[in-house]
Amino acid sequence: MVDLRVVTMDDWPLWRDIRRAALAEAPHAFKSRLADWHRGGEKRWRARLEVPGAHHIVALLDGRAVGMAGGLPGDGGPPELRSVWVSPEARGHGVGDRLIAAVETWALRAGATALRLAVLPGNAPAIALYERHGFVATREPGDLLADGVTRELVMVKALRRS
């Protein structure tokens, strides 16, 4: 059984380990690289968890971290779904669905009416997951990637209270 756990600042080693696993297993899925996170030590890992109003979740299977997702307050816009990843062993079992739903619940409780994300345009499995959850591509230009040409695909979902 998979359990979801909200990550606190004291859980920074857990967050570090799952983030490193995600970047090592799926470097094609993230804008940052594993090497980017080797600098800064504990202070850098804690800084990500100390963002005011942020919400970070880890999926645990038999006590092992097998997935992660985060919600970050928007900078003048809707909050953002960030850093979604599920380990290969846990894929296809609804872990990604549960992580996304948990961030959506967090956003609704914070009063948001929409949730935004940015995904690398070649990440077809992630795009399909997000579309299944009701996210749609926008015309908003995403951040420019390292190649200086490609931009992230920005997607948004209208949130409704049930």
Residue map of PLM features:
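C-terminal "cap" of GNAT-fold acetyltransferases
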Residues: 113-116, 120-127, 131-162
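Acetyl-CoA-dependent GNAT
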Residues: 6-89, 100-102, 106, 138-143, ...
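Extreme N-terminal starter segment of soluble prokaryotic enzymes
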Residues: 1-4
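Conserved glycine-rich acetyl-CoA-binding loop
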Residues: 64, 83, 87-101, 105-110, ...
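Glycine-centered loop/turn positions within well-structured domains
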Residues: 79, 93, 153
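Short, flexible hinge/linker loops that cap or flank conserved catalytic cores
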Residues: 78, 109, 147-149
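Flexible, glycine- and charge-enriched loops at secondary-structure boundaries
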Residues: 35, 93, 148
